[in-house]
């Protein structure tokens, strides 16, 4: 599994555990739906700043 695939899987897992749609996650991260979709499909990788925000959202649920 590539690094992109691993990040994509982990992001999708996080989102599903929270019961969120991609739109919900995008709203909580302050990014577009298209950005979350590209991350989950392994087309792009979140920036370091986005990865920090993802960690924050994962820990707080919002």
Language-model features: locations:
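DNA major-groove recognition helix of helix-turn-helix/homeodomain DNA-binding modules
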Residues: 47-62
């Amino acid at each position: 599994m590539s690094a992109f695939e691993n990040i994509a899987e982990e992001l999708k897992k996080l989102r599903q555990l929270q019961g969120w749609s991609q739109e919900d996650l995008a709203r909580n991260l302050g990014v577009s739906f298209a950005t979350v979709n590209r991350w989950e499909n392994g087309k792009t990788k979140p920036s370091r700043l986005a990865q920090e925000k993802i960690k924050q959202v994962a820990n707080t649920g919002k």
